[in-house]
Amino acid sequence: MAVPDFKKSKFPALSPDITDKDILFEDNHLIAVNKRAGDIVQVDDTGDESLDEKVKRYIAKKYNKPNGAFLGVVHRLDRPVSGVILFAKTSKALDRINKMFKSRDMHKTYWAVVRNRPAQEQGTLIHWLVKNPQKNVTKAYEKEVSGSLRAELHYKLIGELGGYYLIEVDPVTGRPHQIRVQLSTMNCPIVGDNKYGYPRGSLKKSICLHARRLQFIHPVKQEPVNIFAPLPKDGFWDRFENF
């Protein structure tokens, strides 16, 4: 398996508009998109167009809404992370989904590719995290410290190819950079994530962390919803599609 050559990667053009193939789930209340690595979910100080604006434009065009469409941001993914992200199309759905996230009634599953094999094939990681907003870096502590938030996740090794290891992660909490920093604490930094210990960064604005699945009970219809995000088609992730 070829090592991904991050140093020679070309910096990407601005991410294109949302199309039907990017939509993972949609009804009158919710819409889920397969986020591309490099997209920002909401506007920030970079000035780059955000994913929520692209989704608003997609809805307005699809349903002929010249005055624009309502869209509520339910949760976020870090810019270099890909995968399923959910938005609310109505204020009622937004309110109910927000309550579900706070009560941890949303089950999220991520896939991460790391270079080092975990010492234990499965386990639970618990840390106390402190984020430095100026540097946009989160630090993990073994014990509670001033200003820290408890972070918990479960992980399982599910495959290996060419010296790279595929880990499935189920976060219990949703802290900033949680998966990235917690995997790094067990000497398993995510491929491409030099912010948390991988030796080479990615000029593609991407790391090998993908929000693979989101499961919950629909806030209005009260039906089970299981949203599954295909892996990025970038030549590296393709090799893990059959796991």
What are these regions (language model features)?
Residues M1-F243:
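RNA pseudouridine synthases
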